[in-house]
From Swiss-Prot:
Pfam families: Con-6. PANTHER family: UPF0654 PROTEIN C11D3.01C-RELATED. Residues 22-45 have a biased composition (Basic and acidic residues). One of its GO terms (cellular component) is nucleus. It comes from Schizosaccharomyces pombe (strain 972 / ATCC 24843) (Fission yeast). InterPro entries: Conidiation-specific_6, UPF0654_domain. It comes from the Eukaryota. Belongs to the UPF0654 (con-6) family. Residues 1-79 are annotated as: Disordered. This is UPF0654 protein C11D3.01c.
Length: 79
C-alpha cells in the first residue's frame, strides 16, 4: 500500500512541474482539495527527528540569527 504522504507529495509536485499541462494541474489541485487532511497520524513526522533538526539549526554556524531564533521558538512549541 502506498504511503499517503508520498501520494500527496506527488500531486503537489505535479502542480509545480512545468512539463505538466494546465488541465492536469487543475485536476491535481482538485484532488488535493478533496483529500486535504487525509494523511493519517501514523504518517506524521517523527517528533524526535523534528526536534533534532531544530537543535542542529540552532548550533549550525551557517544558519542566520533569525533562523536560529525561529528554530528556538519552534522547539519550544514542540515541548
Amino acid at each position: 500500500m502506498p504511503n499517503p504522504g508520498n501520494v500527496i507529495g506527488g500531486h503537489k509536485a505535479a502542480l509545480h512541474n512545468p512539463n505538466v499541462s494546465e488541465e492536469t494541474k487543475q485536476r491535481e489541485k482538485e484532488y488535493l482539495e478533496e483529500h486535504e487532511g487525509e494523511v493519517g497520524e501514523e504518517h506524521q513526522k517523527n517528533t524526535g527527528n523534528v526536534r533534532g533538526g531544530y537543535k542542529a539549526a540552532m548550533h549550525n554556524p551557517n544558519v542566520s540569527g533569525e533562523a536560529k531564533q525561529r528554530a528556538q521558538e519552534e522547539l519550544e512549541n514542540l515541548e
